Design a protein with these regions (language model features):
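Oxidoreductase cofactor-interface core, primarily capturing Rossmann-like NAD(P)-dependent enzymes
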Residues: 6-9, 98-197
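NAD(P)H-binding glycine-rich loop region in Rossmannoid oxidoreductase-like domains
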Residues: 20, 25-75, 79-82
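SDR active-site strand-loop-helix element
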Residues: 14, 51-52, 88-94, 126-128
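Short, catalytically relevant binding-site loops at active-site mouths
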Residues: 19, 55-56, 94-97, 131-132
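Conserved Rossmann-fold NAD(P)-dependent oxidoreductase catalytic core, especially the SDR/UDP-sugar
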Residues: 59-63, 67-109, 117, 121-124
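Short, glycine/charged-enriched secondary-structure capping and boundary segments
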Residues: 2-4, 25-29, 43-44, 63-66, ...
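Short, polar loop motifs at secondary-structure junctions
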Residues: 13-20
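Rossmann-fold NAD(P)-dependent oxidoreductase module
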Residues: 1-3, 79, 114
């Protein structure tokens, strides 16, 4: 969406491997996330968006999942602050809590707390429920969960509405739309609020 916007003159894509986006505004930066702190961008950065995350199956261990979902995201936050970004929007997860007994929710909660400690001008945290949509890799458990949640969605009303699955594109729309709004400090968007975009 920033590629199509008049608000963004250039879009810097920070990636580990070459992407498929071809656009006159897009500038690709291939960087190892181990060396993220060395990233230099000469343009003035207004908005930074981070949707970095993995699964335990892909990571291979809780420690590796934490490295990606917490540590690399914190590193990205540090870099965006160093580059002078006005706003950082990051994807977390429903139930994120640094005190959770669930390793995934605890990792996401720790990531949120570490980003908040960076004292960024504006931090927007998006906590979607199960992310729906096409993936590069097969995730059988998520496919099953998506089918079940899809069938149950009409029943998930009121406070349960936040547990409805959310299309990844809808999260992206919410991140972009809120980047055009003025929020200072830390603002958390829960899954049911994301569904309104």
């Amino acid at each position: 969406m920033p590629l199509a916007s008049v608000e963004h003159q250039r879009v810097h894509l920070v990636q580990r491997r070459p992407g498929t986006v071809e656009h006159s505004k897009a500038i690709e930066h291939l960087v190892s996330f181990e060396e993220l702190s060395s990233l230099e961008i000469e343009d003035r950065i207004t908005d930074a968006f981070c949707a970095l995350g993995t699964t335990i199956a892909k990571a291979g261990s809780v420690e590796q999942l934490q490295r990606v979902d917490r540590d690399y995201v914190q590193d990205f936050g540090r870099v965006t602050k160093k580059l002078g970004a006005e706003r950082l929007s990051v994807v977390s997860a429903i139930g994120a809590d640094p005190k959770s007994i669930n390793y995934f929710n605890r990792t996401k909660g720790e990531m949120e707390a570490l980003l908040a400690e960076l004292d960024l001008p504006s931090l927007r945290i998006f906590r979607p429920s199960l992310l729906l949509g096409a993936r590069e890799e097969r995730r059988p458990k998520e496919v099953v969960a998506g089918v079940v949640l899809g069938a149950l969605s009409p029943l998930l009303a009121g406070p349960l509405r936040r547990y409805r699955g959310v299309e990844a594109a809808q999260v992206a729309r919410a991140m972009y739309a809120t980047s055009l709004e003025d929020f200072s400090a830390v603002r958390i968007f829960e899954s049911d609020e994301i569904q309104g975009y």
